Amino acid sequence: METIVILGSTGSIGCNALQVIKLHQDKYKVFALTANGNVDLLTEQCSEFEPQFAFALNREANQQLKKNLLALNSKTIVLDDENSLDWLASHKETNTVISAIVGAAGLKPTMAAANSGKKILLANKETLVMAGELFVKAVKQSNATLIPIDSEHNAILQVLPRSKKLNYKSNGIRKILLTASGGPFRTSTKEELKHVTPKEALRHPNWIMGKKITIDSATMMNKGLEVIEACWLFDIPASEIEVVIHPQSIIHSLVEYVDGSTLAQLGNPDMRTPIAYALSHPERIESGVLGLDLIKTKRLDFEAPDLDKFPCLGLAYKALHIGKNAPTILNAANEVAVEAFLKESITFNQIAELIEFCMDAVEPQSLDSIETVLEVDSKTRHLALSWIDCHNLTS
């Protein structure tokens, strides 16, 4: 029986993971569930899956969770220490940690899991973006197992030879092709993007996701973060990662080999598929997802990304080229910018403007510890907030 901690169980990834686990309760036992503030859903999840521990990062939500579970006579223990996430991620009775917390908040507990040699199913791409070198080093030193949940990176893993490590050199890979839907504004003009509203940006054509990642998909920053993530996961330079727009989201990524072969993973756009493969890797288990109907699909289209219209993708490549703390700055500025856009404090196009400003303003420096990473993250956020104060649409 594999014991699992889900960091971020009330989000899209967490909910989908629990759906897959529910199909295989003979194989997987939920050891702990954590969330930020969605106490009602977390209460329901605890009632159904009966984890040994639960924790809500929001203090008021955590107190309410205690009351809710007490009223249900639940045996689940609600933790209240500020280090509870790290403690759960490194707990000796935990085999597997699903890292599904959105943003920089997931960095420390995911690092704790890596340092403890856990099997890490990684959905929190920010860990690799912010602290890729440190995280990969921790995984190797502790002999932890790292399996991506992101559909694109999971697809790459599926078409790599099983016997090889996640390394492009040893697999005869020429390049990786990361597919992107193009988001809701793929056919919009640059002029039209000036007037985009949060409501419009949250209408993703293919995927049902959380707000932050949906906005990232609309700006194509999500794909930029995935390029950075792929560099660390597969030890491949950015020059050998190509982004291809594929509106149908049926092909989740492709790998081109040196012999001229190109292998792709296809499937309906449903996160339960990569989650199921991550859980059972290298074997396969039922996910609850229907098979792909190629006749109904009819066609698969591809096009190059427009970097002029979607500059966030280019900024991610720029961060990789600069190296050092640049990806950390990129990520922090983007998180602040997305939140500001959702509050209608800045425009859609100002998201990229803010990120570029921060990347130019913060001095390059090496990252030798998680503390240094967090310092850069904090400094960038303060700078970004100051920029917003000067450009705030609501002020």
Model-predicted segments: where are they?
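Catalytic, metal-anchored helix/loop core of enzyme active sites in primary metabolism
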Residues: 1-395
